[in-house]
Amino acid sequence: MSSVWGRILGDLRNPLFRQGYALMANTVVTGVLGMGYWLLAAHHYSPEEFGRGQAVITAMRLFASLTALGFVGALARFLPVAGRRTPELVLRGYGLAAATGGVAALGFLLTLPMWGKTYSVLSGFWPGLFFLGSVLVWAVFTLQDVVLTGLRRAPFVPMNNLVFGVVKMGLLVALAGALPSGGIFVSWVIPTALALIPVNWLIFGVVVPRHVKESDAAQEPPRLREIGRFLAGDFPGTLSILGIVYLVPVVVATQVGEATFGRFSMAHTLASMIELLAMNMAVSLTVEGSFDRARLAENCRHALRRAFLIVTPIIVVAILAAPLILTVFGSSFAEEGTTLLRLMSLAVLPRVLIEVYLSALRAQSRARMLATVQIGLAVLVLVSTVVLFPYAGVNAVGYGLLFSELLMGLLIFGNLRKILRGGETGTQAVTQESAGAS
């Protein structure tokens, strides 16, 4: 036991693992509190309101994330080396994410009748305005965690989300009697807005000034043109991946009833949390690859080993215990969601390879390959899901993910192996592309 504890302490001295473990801890915290939140929602609200709340929150996160998550790779890549331009980069990210998400949400509200009766709850001026405001809030909320990670302050992320999750659950229960219709969505948005105040005080009052002070004054911050070239490849690809995460559930919501969507969404959410564990170590890899490019191959090997070591037993448990896990929410959840949870959990294994490869590409600023891999994966998932949906129902999402990620994992494996060995697409390519960018 002491040797295991000693190894963990040793890992925490390595910023790659410290950041990665903090983000994984955040996933566990949000996962446990998220399960508790939806368990309370299932018991305090009607099945129709449960499904409607899931659908509206999913739509809100989709529009808020259109640009916000598109900037995750860019912020993780350039914040470590932004120097005196760090505050400007953060504020530009916030502004662009909020503006783009707001425009998309406005378009959604103007075409509301096209999206089915599930979203009719948003019709009217005040419900629409509240939804629009929630999109702006969630866009900033999404990016503030990325900012903390990019500035090597990821341990603050799970602390913030722990408080946020507890407050959200308390408000959910409090509103069950006062606001039986809409209480789920309101209880999600209000704590999110309140969380922006202390976290951004920490970012702009403490973390950013310290980062600027510790930066090498002689180092030239990245130019907007360099960041733009990176985004030209990474943003379309990331936007495509968002189609897998958020657009697929929205499309499913238009095809099934509210109660059925609620059961689908619970299995989908749980499996997505396992996938986040793999993605968290990959984000840390991008940050450390930007801080220390010479160790990219070594850090890739470390990230790959740790990610598989952590997610494999979780996947095994999810596959074996899927019915038991979902029964907590009700027998109908287990009946309709077990196969989906198993398929999506299994798909995380090839996703580990894909995420580590994408993080290495971001550290190398290889924008064209980033776009190719991400857009290709999104097309595979979306097409296979649409083709299989008439035959497999909501389980088509799981079959589509598993098939697509296995295929993409095979396609990128050769290039990933070269990076792991420090070959021509690894450290040498970093140096060459860095020189080209300057």
Task: Annotate each PLM feature.
Residues 3, 14-72, 232-258, 382-386, ...:
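Signature of the first transmembrane helix
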Residues 47, 112-131, 258, 320-352, ...:
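Interfacial segments at transmembrane-helix termini and the short loops linking adjacent helices
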